[in-house]
Regions:
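Active-site acid/base region of carbohydrate-active enzymes
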Residues: 256, 305, 312-332, 337-339, ...
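Well-ordered alpha-helical scaffold segments within catalytic/enzyme domains
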Residues: 362-371, 404-420, 477-496, 546-556, ...
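Non-catalytic C-terminal accessory modules of carbohydrate-active enzymes
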Residues: 599-739
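Generic helix N-cap/helix-start motif at coil->alpha-helix transitions
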Residues: 539-545, 575-581, 702
Length: 739
């Protein structure tokens, strides 16, 4: 078996090197060889479903947990989250100049009250009288999202309604434009189907190809099939023969050929009994790229296909260069995020199919530009924000809720929607006040909080620390960033006293961070303390440094020392790379270290692509053997080989690095383009912003062009120290990167 797998690896590597020499479509929705199955058309209204903020995420999370339990073998999920509720009320005061018809749709049990009087209606429609009326809808469900969609009487806009789960605390309903079909509830399946044919079929033993896609398998023979695209979906084929056929699936050939079911991350598929008459076989949903088929007595297989479930997206950001290798890295990254995009930006689709706070929110750094699906990002924000009235016992991973405000600010900057922060205002304030109440005398949050005491989890690249249950410097910097961001939103809400309170907490914490964790000799942050919370951990890791840059507290005068002397000399810094890299590479871009960023990308992400993979994994072990690369949690196939968070680094490297895109947080309609093309001759890109699209054609030599939408200002910085080109009017402009 080992010799065959080794030979198989050589054959596949050769084929992948050939196909990667030119641009490849890694996303099934863009692959011309993949068929997108048309969905049944549904009536659409000029309105959209609305629900209590965070409740769609709560029901979606429950769905993910159920899917995970049915399919995944090893699942752990520390922490308590915002609970689902089967009851909601929607209210609005109206004043009509003429009699009007109002229709609605939603779950079965919806009651309308007008001026406090319960209405007896049929057909989910009512005629509203002229004059003032107080409307109240009560929606009750058994086990689905309490929601409603309206049509008529000029009352369709969810932003003009209020929603409550208890008739006491009211807020702005949540909604999204994709949920505009009255016959499809928001928590109903939304995926589209991509029909994928095999990329390669390799007879392994006593098997041969029959025609283009037929397979003849003899007694105890088997074949290996590669679909190229790693997705979650169902396998279907026509089969006739005798005995049984055993189907094994995996993210790698090794996993798909594994005979020991105890080593698998997904429950094994039951053998299928064949008949000589033949028939269609459709197997339960699995995450896979590779499939092996083994027959004990022989079979004829035809019409093999993989029906992958894809979240419907619009590919908003575009990026292309003269270097196909860079293009493929970008496309593979985008596909990694899309594969992981089901209701949320998920953790590994094979191993657990669950949303986690850090994974979901670091993914928005790229996903918000690639796809612009604000609701998916908001779902991640909701699970990161703690449940109402949080307690210490609710904590799973102490630093994970601190990603929520990072995601909220990213969401506000990208979409320009203050409504989101207002919808989650109570939970934002409760989160910040909760953390302020559980810190020690220095204002520090500890890693041993929570019933399970899971500990800090900055990612898996912790060879240099910090320890899990001490006082980690990076977590305190995250808390500082949360206070600063809380003040930022309080200012937007025009609540000056609240903003001042958070600014004071931030000032005091920043002072303590430098007193306890700044190493003035080495000009970096140390890790913090060991698990006893007393012994100082003077080791240096990258986590506190990049959070320091993102939070604007790492001294800029020490950037050179950090990037030239400290980081390159950290043990295993380049050898063990994890899913926090999207954050860290954003810090690289912010510090202007574009060459170092891309050298890191080529060395890690490029190496993974060169090995023939089509998605990026949760963690990289650069010096490990092929078998060891797949091991995680001491399980032979425990590593997730498609992890949305690691689709982010290359996109950040392209958007914030090569293009040099950034946005002012104080004047949010002001953008900066600071290109650094490195070896590239040209870049063509379309960047979605809240005002529309910025379209760029950057040329290292000669004329470059830019088109900007109305309502924004774009600054183009061509050289350090030179006056920037400032563009304030909608239209197209030309310029040169070199004078």
């Amino acid at each position: 078996m080992n010799k065959k797998i080794k030979l198989l690896g050589i054959l596949m590597t050769v084929s992948f090197l050939c196909c990667y020499a030119q641009t490849k479509e890694f996303d099934p929705s863009l692959d011309p060889n993949v068929t997108i199955v048309s969905r049944q058309s549904q009536e659409e209204w000029n309105s959209r479903y609305m629900w209590y903020p965070g409740q769609l995420a709560a029901f979606y999370q429950q769905q993910c947990a159920r899917i995970s339990k049915e399919r995944c073998v090893n699942v752990g999920y520390p922490g308590k989250f915002f609970a689902k509720n089967n009851h909601a009320w929607f209210r609005k005061e109206v004043r009509l100049k003429k009699e009007s018809s109002l229709c609605w749709e939603g779950p079965s049990d919806i009651i309308l009250y007008i001026n406090g009087v319960k209405q007896s209606v049929s057909g989910k429609q009512v005629i509203l009288s002229v004059g003032r009326s107080s409307l109240l809808f009560e929606v009750t469900t058994d086990d689905s999202l309490p929601c409603i969609i309206l049509k008529g009487a000029g009352l369709e806009n969810p932003d003009e309604w209020q929603v409550s789960m208890d008739k006491e605390h009211w807020t702005i309903p949540e909604s999204a434009v994709m949920y505009n079909k009255p016959g499809v509830l928001p928590d109903a399946p939304q995926d589209m189907t991509a029909r994928i044919k095999p990329s390669q079929i390799l007879p392994m033993r006593n098997a041969e190809m029959q025609g283009k896609d037929g397979i003849s398998i003899g007694k105890n023979g088997y074949v290996l099939i590669d679909f190229f695209h790693l997705e979650i979906g169902t396998l279907t084929f026509q089969a006739k023969g005798k005995g049984t056929i055993t189907v094994r699936v995996g993210e790698t050939p090794e996993e798909a050929l594994e005979r020991d079911d105890k080593k698998l991350e997904q429950y094994p598929l039951a053998p299928v009994t064949l008949s000589e008459e033949g028939g269609t076989i459709t197997l339960p949903e699995r995450a896979l790229r590779y499939v092996s088929l083994e027959c004990d007595k022989g079979a004829e297989i035809t019409s093999l296909r993989f029906d992958a479930s894809l979240w419907p997206v619009e590919h908003q950001m575009q990026f292309e260069t003269d270097d196909d290798y860079v293009n493929n890295l970008f496309k593979m990254s985008s596909a990694t995020l899309h594969t992981s995009m089901h209701r949320f930006y998920l953790d590994g689709v094979k191993r657990d199919f669950l949303p986690w706070s850090m994974d979901a929110l670091v993914s928005t750094l790229a996903g918000d530009y690639l796809f612009g699906d604000q609701q998916v990002s908001k779902n991640g924000i909701s699970i990161a924000l703690m449940p109402l009235d949080p307690q210490k016992s609710d904590i799973g991973i102490p630093d994970y809720p601190l990603h929520a405000l990072f995601g909220l600010k990213q969401n506000y900057l990208r979409f320009g929607d203050l409504t989101t922060s207002l919808q989650y205002k109570d939970r934002i304030i409760q989160l910040l006040d909760f953390y302020a109440s559980i810190v020690d005398e220095n204002g520090f949050v500890h890693g041993n909080y929570g019933d399970r005491q899971f500990g800090y989890t900055p990612g898996w690249s912790t060879y240099n620390g910090p320890v899990r249950k001490g006082v980690a410097a990076y977590a305190q910097i995250m808390l500082y960033y949360n206070y600063v961001t809380g003040a930022y939103f309080a200012d937007l809400w025009k609540e000056s006293a609240l903003a001042d309170r958070y600014r004071k907490l931030a000032r005091n914490l920043k002072k303590k961070i430098f007193e306890h964790f700044w190493d003035d000799d080495r000009k970096v942050f140390i890790n913090g303390t060991m698990n006893d919370n007393v012994t100082v951990d003077k080791r240096i890791s990258h986590h506190a440094q990049y959070w320091g840059i993102l939070a604007d507290i790492f001294p800029k005068e020490h950037y050179d020392n950090l990037f030239e002397n400290v980081l390159p000399n950290l043990p295993n810094y380049y050898e063990v790379v994890s899913y926090e890299k999207g954050y860290e590479f954003l810090a690289y871009a912010k510090a202007g270290r574009i060459k170092e960023l891309w050298d890191h990308i080529y060395g890690v992400f490029g190496d993974w692509m060169d090995q023939g993979h089509t998605r990026f994994p949760e963690n990289f072990m650069m010096n490990a053997s092929r078998a060891r690369q797949l091991v995680f949690y001491n399980r032979p196939y425990g590593l997730s080989l498609c992890h949305g968070a690691n689709g982010v680094p290359v996109v950040v490297g392209a958007l914030n690095g090569l293009i040099g895109f950034s946005q002012s947080s104080m004047k949010t309609n002001e953008y900066t383009i600071k290109p650094e093309l490195l070896h590239l001759k040209w870049i063509h890109s379309r960047i979605p912003v809240k005002e529309g699209y910025i379209v760029l054609k950057l040329n290292a030599e000669g004329e470059s062009t830019i088109d900007i939408p109305a309502g924004c200002t774009v600054r183009i910085i061509k050289k350090i120290g030179k006056k920037p080109l400032v563009l304030r009017e909608q239209g197209g402009y030309s310029f040169r990167l070199k004078d």
